């Protein structure tokens, strides 16, 4: 099979991952914090090493990752592994997250390469100008989100007060390795190619719920050296990302 963009049908699953057994508690007295004052645009790429159209989309998102005010994340999905190459970065929960967007946006299928911007809209990753336009339009959309503050200790994050959506929101931690990574693909449509990725996600966890009141959450304790974490507050219903921040050094 040699196609630019792939789609796959199947039952719609609820977006989610393994819940963290952390303690969520009201944010009390504040310690020294690092605050991200600018609301970023979150760009989530769903890709696969065995998808022939994905290397081009990976390059589009890598270019976006260098733009100020953009948080770019790469999720490798596993539903193309059966074609002959098991994706080295894929995890089942990443495909579940993509299917959550499929349900919220009422899409007929999931596909690769797909780019989701701020959880509000999606576009094919093969369409570079369309991706850039969507990011620019979302950057111009400014709301009044809750503030996210990473504690200097590195083990906790606070989400401040704000207007919660009807039905509430969820707080997610996305652990990723900043920068590019390359993989030599040994099978499938990209056999023999070196496929480059940026900001590859390793772990996705729900930290807890957010209902508009300040809460302090424990961050995943199993991060590896060199990894960073994005914390995002996301509408439970339509999956819109209300706000996000990364602890990656500026």
Positions of predicted regions on the chain:
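Charged, low-complexity surface segments at secondary-structure and domain boundaries
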Residues: 83, 118-121
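Short, conserved sequence motifs used for protein processing/export or organelle targeting and
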Residues: 88-112, 120-250
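Ligand-binding face of N-terminal immunoglobulin V-set domains in extracellular IgSF glycoproteins
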Residues: 115
């Amino acid at each position: 099979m040699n196609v630019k963009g792939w789609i796959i049908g199947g039952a719609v699953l609820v977006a989610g991952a393994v819940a963290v057994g952390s303690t969520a508690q009201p944010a009390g007295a504040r310690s020294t914090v690092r605050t991200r004052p600018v609301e970023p645009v979150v760009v989530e790429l769903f890709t696969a090493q065995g998808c022939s159209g994905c290397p081009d989309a990976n390059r589009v998102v890598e270019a976006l990752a260098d733009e100020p005010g953009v948080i770019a994340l790469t999720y490798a999905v596993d539903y193309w592994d059966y074609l002959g190459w098991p994706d080295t970065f894929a995890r089942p929960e990443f495909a579940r997250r993509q299917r959550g967007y499929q349900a919220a946006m009422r899409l007929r299928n999931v596909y690769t390469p797909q780019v989701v911007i701020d959880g509000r809209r999606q576009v094919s990753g093969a369409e570079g100008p369309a991706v850039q336009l969507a990011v620019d339009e979302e950057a111009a959309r400014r709301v009044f989100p809750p503030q996210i503050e990473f504690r200097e200790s590195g083990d906790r994050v606070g989400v401040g007060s704000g207007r919660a959506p009807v039905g509430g929101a969820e707080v997610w931690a996305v652990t990723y390795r900043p920068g590019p990574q390359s993989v030599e693909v040994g099978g499938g449509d990209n056999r023999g190619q070196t496929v480059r990725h940026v900001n590859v996600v390793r772990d996705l966890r729900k930290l807890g719920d957010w209902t508009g009141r300040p809460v302090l959450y424990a961050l995943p304790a199993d991060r590896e050296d060199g990894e960073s974490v994005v914390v995002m507050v996301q509408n439970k219903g339509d999956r819109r990302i209300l706000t996000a921040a990364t602890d990656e050094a500026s």
